[in-house]
A protein has these predicted regions:
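Extracellular glycan-interacting surfaces
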Residues: 1-371
Length: 371
């Protein structure tokens, strides 16, 4: 029977949750790297035994870890992330220039075809690539070199490149999302990038419809329809039907259009999921009721999903990297909370169960579907 491996990054280590295809009984392994913040860990689509992890500490800095046996053993790999070329500064919160400084790896995105190739999104925002399993990293400097680079400003969590979408057709398109500069896309494998923010509007900007400056929390894509992109912005849920060239709002009847995560059902490119959060100052679900909302119409209409989720007194957050889907049918949906719970649904969101409780605050959730 097929199986599922859920990779959970938390503020105090990584945990690996496994189940067979029924997804009704789970084993929990961890913590790996106990005491360290694990911003993200993700498995290679080309080799399920290859997993990359971003290990970070305010005291000891950044370490990239690699496993070749499904997370049983780990090896520290290359950890030098050197910016090349300009610009020399970006804008700070108050608008003053500030030198670019590497802090941590926010997101790791393995190649869809080659387990040795992996991309890293970092803070301060830049995109790096390794062709040797993470041993050496080279900046794809065309992103920061865009004429707007010196005007990028951080969001509340810093100036971070937190999302990387690789071309599911095998081509050279790359989409990245930066808080808070916006979405940038490349058609040539990362040599050059252009903003993809037309249609976004942010009231906190001097020009709400500016080319850059939008606090994009997450973007998602389905491989069967790569021209359609979905976005959870600081406020607003958005959709693009033309590869990010234009966006329009699809928040509809959601109880709040603020949130962090968004994902797409593996078996239906028009079925998407979000977790509404009350506001940018109240980081918990509306009325303390933890709910996932699902749209089967690409965002035109939404329905509340709560069977098995807390109905009251729930004041947790679900962060941008903390939701993922498996590739089984029916599709499994998984998310983690800042309260340390990881919830899973084996039936596309109709019902939920707590896979594990009382972990440290969950920073990221990724899923591997195993043969």
């Amino acid at each position: 029977m097929s199986g599922v491996r859920v990779l959970v990054g938390t503020k105090k280590g990584a945990f690996i949750l496994t189940a067979d295809g029924a997804r009704d009984a789970w084993s929990v392994d961890g913590p790996h790297f106990g005491g360290w913040e694990i911003y993200h860990l993700k498995g290679s689509p080309a080799d399920p035994n290859r997993i990359y992890a971003s290990q970070s500490s305010g005291w000891f800095g950044q370490v990239v870890q690699r496993s070749d046996d499904g997370g049983k053993h780990w090896e520290a790999v290359g950890n030098e992330f050197a910016y090349v070329g300009g610009p020399e500064t970006h804008q700070w919160y108050d608008g003053t220039p500030r030198p670019w400084e590497f802090t941590r790896v926010w997101h790791l995105e393995p190649s869809l075809a080659d387990p040795e190739v992996v991309y890293a999104g970092v803070q301060d925002a830049a995109l790096f690539r390794s062709d040797d399993g993470g041993e050496h990293w080279n900046e794809l400097a065309g992103l920061r070199a865009h004429r707007t680079g010196s005007a990028w400003q951080p969001g509340a969590g810093g100036l971070c490149l937190h999302t990387i979408l690789l071309d599911p057709t095998g081509g050279e398109k790359i989409f990245t999302a930066i808080s808070s500069a916006g979405v940038f896309g490349s058609d040539d494998g990362g040599a050059h990038f252009a903003p993809k923010n037309v249609g976004l509007s942010s009231e906190y900007l001097p020009d709400p419809d500016a080319e850059i400056g939008h606090c994009v929390h997450r973007i998602a894509q389905h491989p069967a329809r790569p021209e359609v992109l979905y976005m959870q912005k600081h406020w607003d849920v958005m959709r693009s039907d033309d590869g990010g060239e234009h966006w329009h709002e699809v928040s509809g009847n959601l109880p709040s259009d603020f949130g962090f995560c968004i994902d797409v059902n593996a078996n239906d490119p028009e079925t998407i999921y979000v977790v509404p959060i009350t506001s940018d100052s109240l980081h918990y679900p509306p009325e303390g009721r933890l709910r996932v909302w699902r749209s089967r119409t690409a965002g035109d209409e939404w329905e509340e999903l709560g069977r098995g989720l807390p109905d009251k007194d729930c004041y947790v957050d679900v962060l941008r990297d903390a939701m993922a889907v498996d590739q089984l049918d029916p599709c499994g949906i998984y998310f983690g909370t800042t309260g340390g719970q990881v919830y899973g649904s084996p039936d596309g969101g109709d019902t939920w169960q707590a896979i594990v409780r009382d972990l440290p605050a969950v920073l990221s959730v990724e899923v591997q579907s195993l043969a």
